């Protein structure tokens, strides 16, 4: 649990926390506010992310994600729901380029006998966990 510094990139700061604390498997939640945001939507037919840049202050209504390994390092995969001053909600895949205004977070580390490493999934075009 903790608070991120104002100006930190939200996604990178969460990944840095996981790396610094050697957290390789778990989940993350957060709330707070950002000065602007970048969220993505994965077009399943094109197998391509499209990004929405929201150039305004926003409240983090919910951020939920998981932590696993990608290329041997902890990776945070998070989705976020944000609201503007008029109460409109926006959401999607959290992308780099989302500076923190204020953010409190909690990480729940899983103690497992193995780690999950992301791998290319040719069926979806995404980097996913292996099938269970």
Task: Please tell me what each predicted stretch does.
Residues 1-76, 81-132:
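N-terminal intrinsically disordered, cationic/polar leader segments
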């Amino acid at each position: 649990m903790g608070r991120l510094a104002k100006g930190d990139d939200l996604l990178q700061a969460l990944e840095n926390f996981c790396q610094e604390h050697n957290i390789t498997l778990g989940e993350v939640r957060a709330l707070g506010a950002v000065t602007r945001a970048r969220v993505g939507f994965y077009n399943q037919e094109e197998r391509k992310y499209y990004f929405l840049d929201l150039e305004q202050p926003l409240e983090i209504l919910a951020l939920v994600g998981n932590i696993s390994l990608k290329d041997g390092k902890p990776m945070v995969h998070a989705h976020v729901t944000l609201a503007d001053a008029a109460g409109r909600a926006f959401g999607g895949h959290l992308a780099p380029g989302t500076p923190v205004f204020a953010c409190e977070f909690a990480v729940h580390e899983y103690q497992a006998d193995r780690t999950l490493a992301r791998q290319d999934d040719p069926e979806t075009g995404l980097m996913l966990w292996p099938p269970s």
